[in-house]
Amino acid sequence: MAELNVLQEKILSDGVIRPGNVLKVDSFLNHQIDVPFISELGKEFKKLFGDRKVDKILTIEASGIGIACLTAVYFGVPVVFAKKSAGSNMDKEMFATEVMSYTHNRKNHVVVSKKYLKPGEHIL
């Protein structure tokens, strides 16, 4: 994916490898968001996947939301994010799975309401 060289360059210039091979990118993504840079990533995702039908963009709660939102601007579609906990106001019908957080070195149980992901939709 040569198109994402902008991301590779940003990681090389601003990212830090922490013990356990965890990539720290808090200067532009998960503590402070470099909005113009993330917007450029959104454009790159549109270039990479623009020839495909996309109805929604799915990400996980936290660091993925910024990238997903700015990518969604270029696709003109909504963003759905997997929540790390099902609150009392969440629908009972939901998709659920476990994902590994390498940042926190633990598995998280995540959920998405079935109300927002329908059969036949094309999800990026």
Residue positions per predicted region:
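Active-site-facing substrate-recognition patch
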Residues: 1-54
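A glycine-rich, hydrophobic loop/mini-helix early in the fold
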Residues: 44-45, 58, 75, 81
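Short glycine-rich phosphate-binding loop at a beta-alpha junction
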Residues: 53-61
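Short glycine-rich or small-residue beta-strand-to-loop segments that form or flank ligand, phosphate
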Residues: 58, 123-124
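Short Gly/Thr/Asp-enriched flexible loops that form oxyanion-binding sites at enzyme active sites
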Residues: 66-75
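Short, glycine/charge-rich flexible loops or terminal/linker lids adjacent to PRPP-binding catalytic cores
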Residues: 78-123
